[in-house]
Regions:
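C-terminal target-recognition/interaction regions appended to catalytic cores
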Residues: 89-250
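Class I S-adenosyl-L-methionine
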Residues: 1-162
Length: 250
């Protein structure tokens, strides 16, 4: 089974989209549609419905690894694998999916520490113009090293980041004082600042201080940029554990 899951669409404090895969070695024959939408581990952990604008696709994968490697996807412009799907014995059932969630939503502002806990080096005071340039939209002529001239353009990034929405995706470059387009900046008590490591821990749904093991702040930020939003594997694990309990009782 696989789902492409945006953590924020299930109430978590970060907009982070990743593929989550669950597999069994010796599973009984599945009802593919039921497995995808109802009985599957991921369907129970993260409910979905099919996006009605697109059809559900069925196709088969060649069982011979050599043939599959050389022939799969030839002539296909868009991947046959969609947002969610199941596969068993080479048979694939997949679709574009819409999340089903009606619970509470956590946002960036929920994870901020008090301003008194923020070290002075996290406040932005001297190089504000650099931050404004990098965060802003732009369309400008640039010249490559080989002399080729081109127009570089990009849209603006929220500056500061909205506190009433889940954070953007945390990247490995979140640490360090230098201005950056991708780092988060929040406004607190009228002052702009970067996120501290304890906040990054919590945006990945680790306990506050999880990475406070003696590492530098930059290394802590790097670790969180490489992490998953842990609420997702936790919910998948809860379903797996419940199934294991049922199997043992039988």
């Amino acid at each position: 089974e696989w789902h492409v899951i945006n953590a924020a669409e299930y109430g978590m404090p970060q907009r982070r989209r990743r593929v989550y895969i669950y597999a069994e070695l010796d599973a009984p024959k599945w009802d593919m549609e039921d497995r995808l939408f109802h009985s599957g581990v991921e369907a129970r952990a993260f409910p979905i419905v099919a996006d009605g604008r697109f059809g559900v696709e069925r196709f088969c994968i060649e069982k011979d690894p050599y043939e599959m490697t050389h022939t799969f996807g030839k002539g296909v412009k868009v991947s046959q694998f969609k947002d969610a799907g199941v596969m068993q014995d080479g048979e694939v059932f997949t679709c574009r999916a819409t999340p089903v969630y009606s619970g509470k939503h956590s946002v960036l502002g929920d994870k901020l520490v008090s301003i008194g806990e923020v070290p002075s080096e996290f406040f932005i005071e001297d190089n504000l113009s650099s931050w404004e340039y990098l965060k802003g939209g732009k369309k400008e002529q640039r010249t490559a090293r080989n002399g080729y001239e081109y127009t570089y353009s990009e849209g603006p990034v929220a500056f500061p980041d909205a506190l009433d929405k889940p954070s953007r995706t945390i990247l490995t470059g979140e640490g360090g004082r230098g201005a950056s387009r991708t780092k988060h900046v929040v406004e607190q008590n009228g002052r702009l600042r970067r996120l501290v490591p304890d906040e990054l821990d919590q945006l990945q749904m680790f306990p506050r201080g999880w990475t406070d093991t003696g590492m530098t702040d930059g290394h802590r930020a790097f670790c969180m940029g490489n992490a998953l939003v842990t609420g997702i594997p936790h919910r998948i694990g809860v379903v797996i554990a419940a199934d294991a309990d049922v199997s043992r009782s039988e």
